[in-house]
Amino acid sequence: LKILVVIPVFNESKHILKCLQSFYEQSYKNIDWILVNDSSTDNSKEIIEEFIKDKPTFGLTNLINSSEHVPGAKVVKTFYAGLNSVNWKQYDVLVKLDADIILPENYFELIVNELQNNPKIGIIGGLVYIKKGNQWVYENISNKNHVRGPIKTYRKECFIDIGGLRMTLGWDNLDILLARMHHWEVKVLKNLFVKHLKPTAYVYQETKSRKLGEYFYNIGLSKKLAFISCAKSSWKEKSLRHFIISFKTFISLEKEKKERVITQEEMNFIRKFRWNEMIKKFKR
């Protein structure tokens, strides 16, 4: 299988060299790498240029004055700048990696084995670990059956079926829901760990709550589903304020009829899927 890896980069000079080294040392070699420098203001560009100058499977695309500030949209836009810089349809597997990720040497070897053994797998990845003290521990911001945004691997046919990545907050959950809609399997290799050098930022609680409400709107939840989902999240957070802000955000977006990046058919599937998942959990 021929792999194309696209890595959006913004001000990663502190980590990028270690990450590049781990990419270059992959035991699986049928990989092309494209780094997309999204107008970095540090010396990320120079570090990348120096590293890749004698490595023909690595390429660099530079974006000038990127001005997209919509959460979620910026990274997807940067990803597409790299993807569309080549004829990506000649590849079998498409990957979006963050620029602060260190891969174990056999990462893509194990990924390819799984894809070859099971043609139904559409999205696959390992688990993301962060450093706490002297130990690497699971970055516990999603369940262990979810392929995280920093390490997305898509079978090309699945990527095409889901209409690629959507430029919206929540793109990295939407892709998985749409893959299920098109009868693709999603697999997490729980014995395969990657190191996340710059843990996912913890924003102010109010911003986090607003983003959750926006995410529920973006993926097409109904008012009832959003109410239950916001309530469940606020129960976990032990915060009534979290519920009020997230649900209020959802309602205000619904009132202004903000445009979504999904079709009615996709929305109907997502609502049905979420209800079914909720009922399954309730029955346990």
Question: What does each model-identified segment do?
Answer:
Residues 67, 102-138:
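Conserved donor NDP-sugar-binding/catalytic core segment of glycosyltransferases
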Residues 208-284:
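Non-catalytic, C-terminal membrane-associated alpha-helical segments of glycosyltransferases
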Residues 21-30:
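Short, acidic, metal-binding catalytic loop of nucleotide-sugar glycosyltransferases
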Residues 37-46, 66, 101:
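A conserved acidic beta->alpha catalytic loop
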Residues 76-93:
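Active-site nucleotide-sugar/metal-binding loop of Leloir-type enzymes
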Residues 2-4, 32, 174:
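Cell-envelope/extracellular polymer assembly enzymes that use nucleotide-activated donors
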Residues 148-163:
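Conserved nucleotide-sugar donor-binding
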